[in-house]
Design a protein with these regions (language model features):
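Hydrophobic alpha-helical transmembrane segments
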Residues: 2-65, 72, 76-84, 88-111
Length: 111
């Protein structure tokens, strides 16, 4: 059973070395710390964890797409630029959604 999960854990370890993934993981750690400080409710924790998972998953998939595109060609190709930009846009959408959820939770504790 342990062997089945080895590639997945190796993938996470590899993701830590990617700048975009590392940035999202640092932001996730900050969100978790803020959650403990604010004493979030169970449902708020669920929202935070889903948002963190969504953004980190999007970032890892973006990294995969970029690397596959780089295998195809290292020279500029408009099609590859479009593919990479679309993948980056997906990360941005997930990050904005997570930020909005976080702000809603934050303001509910401040106000």
């Amino acid at each position: 059973m342990k062997e089945k999960f080895r590639p997945a854990f190796q993938g996470l370890a590899d993701a830590v070395h990617d700048q975009g993934c590392r940035t999202q993981m640092i932001l996730a750690a900050l969100a978790l710390c803020a959650g403990f400080i604010l004493k979030l409710s169970a449902i708020e924790w669920v929202a935070v964890i889903i948002c963190i998972g969504m953004v980190i998953t999007a970032e890892i998939l973006n990294t995969c797409i970029e690397r596959v595109c780089d295998l195809y060609s290292n020279e500029f190709d408009e099609r590859i630029r479009l593919i990479k930009d679309l993948a980056a846009g997906a990360v941005l959408v997930s990050a904005i959604a997570a930020l909005l959820c976080s702000l809603i939770i934050l303001f509910s504790h401040i106000g």
